[in-house]
């Protein structure tokens, strides 16, 4: 049962009619995308905060129509109809609502709580209609405030709760951002329980929580050392199909260590292996602290079923078994490195290369096609797919734009051709790799030079060049080609921007690790292909219970990667 807070008036007998009515709405209607219980209370809410709504406000402020005037529209056009599009746009931008939005955005950027509250009070005095956006920015700015003390009172927190109440009174429909900012307010007041209540209430409004929605409650409970409540929030996340990231898992790891819950530490390490793979320095240090702790020394079994462990490793694809802590006694914990073959320089154990399920690859290719068709001109991408079926498969796909610019001030066809030749040399079929280039690079600039034009014609005649159409993002093309051909992808692109985040953290990092080839160019060695490592750079758990944890680095070509090796001093 939810606690009765200022954010849960619907659970009080003295609640406002708005929330009381919502409890009577059948669930089949409550979650319908077109149903909104607020319509019966505020007919203009359907366009509240939208461009249409702002137009309505401008027109009402300029022309207070009556029925007779409206009936006379046939004989004379209203002044608003004579306004140019530019004038209408200017009127919208200068409306009280738009000006308030601009000023609140500036307060949000600067974290200026006092100015935001002053603007809010002024807007209410002047009768400015606040939209969902206005309220969300106000709540966000108030949530930035730190907890008040006797010597330093903070008006942002107390006023934030009042603003939330006023939003409900004004019958403004809340969204995910509203509840998330409310949760942040609660945590700023040192009340993670209230923050968790906010997340629970989202379902009553048909709102799907996001990862950021859970952060205030989860981190709040972890800071307080309330492990049970933190696990409850985590379970709610799993139920809502919200996937945690490293900060959330690190917080759960810390609270599990502090409460000496070895089973939870083990499960969290497995989740870090699955979802994060390589950990940041702070998490790396925390894991090192665990293996050096007395609790870790005393945790584990002396005997285990070797066949069961081995079968679990095989069924999991290699690199882990998930059967719990193996062995007893003190851990030998060292920071180390791997050699080029994946052999630990500390314990001499060779790390494994974790398999990729072929079914996963096919599913990923289908997902990639769907995403590309949503963001590219579908006909263009389908045309590329048909071309690839006729000319493929290839042993390697080259991100031409990236390869021509590595360590170069301007695009270099010489370097791109050098990359093509190196890839052809290592190809089992000795076939030319597929070069993906934007049409602008194929038709203009250095491409017009006779030598480069001849090179492009050679690739084109061999069916090894594809020019992506104007306005397209060539990233979709070279990535799809490499995935569908199950071949190497030659690019120094780290693939971390928004486009690649759409692909998720489950399969794509594993695929990239096994298929991406990067180049390095030096005066001494010239151009060198850096092949995928023969082992997986991911947290690994051996059949004897030994752990190897990799630290994430920006560029492991330039910086050697540190690993944590944790092995029992005594083995059965």
From Swiss-Prot:
PPR repeats lie at residues 96-130, 136-174, 175-209, 210-244. Belongs to the PPR family. P subfamily. Keywords: Chloroplast, Hydrolase, Magnesium, Manganese, Metal-binding, Mitochondrion, Nuclease, Plastid, Repeat, Transit peptide, tRNA processing, Zinc. Residues 338-565 form the PRORP domain. CDD domains: PIN_PRORP-Zc3h12a-like (cd18671). Binds 2 Mg(2+) or Mg(2+) ions per subunit. One of its GO terms (molecular function) is metal ion binding. One of its GO terms (cellular component) is mitochondrion. Residues 1-70 form a transit peptide. Zn(2+) binds at residues 344, 347, 548, 565. Mn(2+) 1 binds at residues 399, 474. Its EC number is 3.1.26.5. Pfam families: PPR_long, PRORP. Endonuclease RNase P responsible for the 5' maturation of tRNA precursors. Preferentially cleaves at the unusual cleavage site, but also able to cleave at the classical cleavage site. Also involved in the maturation of mRNAs in mitochondria. Changing residue 474 to N: Abolishes ribonuclease activity. The gene is PRORP1. It catalyses: Endonucleolytic cleavage of RNA, removing 5'-extranucleotides from tRNA precursor. Disruption phenotype: Embryo lethality when homozygous. This is Proteinaceous RNase P 1, chloroplastic/mitochondrial. PROSITE patterns: PPR. Its cofactor is Mg(2+); Mn(2+). It comes from Arabidopsis thaliana (Mouse-ear cress). One of its GO terms (biological process) is tRNA processing. The keyword Ligase does not apply. Mn(2+) 2 binds at residues 475, 493. It is found in: Mitochondrion; Plastid, Chloroplast.
